Amino acid sequence: MASFQDRAQHTIAQLDKELSKYPVLNNLERQTSVPKVYVILGLGGIYTFLVFFNIAGQLLVNLAGFILPTYYSLDALFSAGKADDTQWLTYWVVYAFFTVVESAISAPYWFPFYYIFKFALVLWLALPQTNGAQIVFKSLVQPLVGRYFTGGSTSANLRAQADAATKSQ
């Protein structure tokens, strides 16, 4: 069984390999002589510290929920496929839903360390590997507002017919 140090070194090596794909980070490493892995881990640590102690927590978490999803949404709009369009449209609907609920109940006032939990939620919602936005949409948003859209929507009717056809088989 590998020791913790061996596993940490392996993870750092994998992260370094992944970060090597970005020329900006390679240039930064050459200019500063600081390994790009340590720069990213340091910035991530500072970011987490600021969010944890709510030093601009709202701004930092909203940036996390906005910058990367916006990039991927624009990428999806310029791609030929439609699956990624649906994924990011679902993300934005769920993100907007949570933003409205957050404002309505003054969540940061009532929940300690709210922005740490929101950051984890935003990551879970946004990462395609987790399908968080689709899970929340199908289990929470769709039951609440779906009945207002299914009757007149052609895509909803087609979706219902496809679901019925797959269930009958």
From Swiss-Prot:
Cytoplasmic topological segments: 1-35, 77-88, 125-169
GO CC field: endoplasmic reticulum membrane; Golgi membrane
Keyword Nuclease: no
Name of this chain's protein: Protein yop1
Cell location: Endoplasmic reticulum membrane; Golgi apparatus membrane
Gene: yop1
Organism: Emericella nidulans (strain FGSC A4 / ATCC 38163 / CBS 112.46 / NRRL 194 / M139) (Aspergillus nidulans)
Pfam families: TB2_DP1_HVA22
Family according to the record: Belongs to the DP1 family.
Role this protein plays: Required to generate and maintain the structure of the tubular endoplasmic reticulum network and the vacuole. Induces high curvature in membranes and causes membrane tubule formation. Involved in membrane/vesicle trafficking.
Superkingdom of this protein's organism: Eukaryota
